[in-house]
Amino acid sequence: MAEISRIQYEMEYTEGISQRMRVPEKLKVAPPNADLEQGFQDGVPNASVIMQVPERIVVTGNNEDISFSRPADLDLIQSTPFKPLALKTPPRVLTLSERPLDFLDLERPPPTPQSEEIRAVGRLKRERSMSENAVRQNGQLVRNDSMYGISSLDAAVEGASEDMSVVDAASLRRQIIKLNRRLQLLEEENKERAKREMVMYSITVAFWLLNSWLWFRR
């Protein structure tokens, strides 16, 4: 309900605006610090200007005279001639001139004794670092092998203990099954014994009752 009333209000509002609001054809311009109401009362007509969109806007200083009909920068731009630029189309195929691959070595300066010594020292350092890395890698391999052996031994011990636990669990299960069977047999024997005792007790009681009745009859 509230939504319908809001839509109706908006329609009435837009309709009222479209019917009542009008764009003026002229705007009256009054001098600064002038009283418009007094001017209307005195009957002094205010200046009116027809609204038109200017073709361009020129910005000048405070006391400069607008003597030119167009901006100076546009005149400068249009007065300076542009030099034509010649552009060449790039080739479709790029070719490399035949030249030996070792031309860079040929262009290098001849080695000096100092550079030879520096190269020899660098080569020795590289060989030493390579040997140290090889020793470290071998040590790491030996350590990894020992750790792998210890871990495999632990795994074997754990596997054996797990196997023993599985065997123990199976044997315990068998013993429990046997004990259950024995208990069931004992319970059945006790039930049969109780039945026999009840029968024997009832027979003896009947026998004593019959004897006592016969004795009283005599």
Swiss-Prot record:
Topological type in the membrane: Single-pass type IV membrane protein
Keywords noted in UniProt: Coiled coil, Cytoplasmic vesicle, Membrane, Mitochondrion, Mitochondrion outer membrane, Peroxisome, Phosphoprotein, Synapse, Transmembrane, Transmembrane helix
Record topology, Cytoplasmic segments: 1-198
Segments crossing the lipid bilayer: 199-216
Recorded GO MF terms: GTPase binding; identical protein binding; protein homodimerization activity; protein-containing complex binding
GO terms for biological process, alphabetical: cellular response to hydrogen peroxide; mitochondrial fission; mitochondrion organization; peroxisome fission; positive regulation of cardiac muscle cell apoptotic process; positive regulation of mitochondrial fission; positive regulation of synaptic vesicle endocytosis; protein targeting to mitochondrion
Modified residues (Phosphoserine): S129, S131, S146, S171
Mitochondrial intermembrane topological segments: 217-218
Disulfide bonds: none
Annotated function: Plays a role in mitochondrial and peroxisomal fission. Promotes the recruitment and association of the fission mediator dynamin-related protein 1 (DNM1L) to the mitochondrial surface. May be involved in regulation of synaptic vesicle membrane dynamics by recruitment of DNM1L to clathrin-containing vesicles.
PANTHER family in alphabetical order: MITOCHONDRIAL FISSION FACTOR (PTHR16501:SF17), TRANSPORT AND GOLGI ORGANIZATION PROTEIN 11 (PTHR16501)
Family to which this protein belongs: Belongs to the Tango11 family.
Name of protein: Mitochondrial fission factor
Organism: Rattus norvegicus
Gene this chain is encoded by: Mff
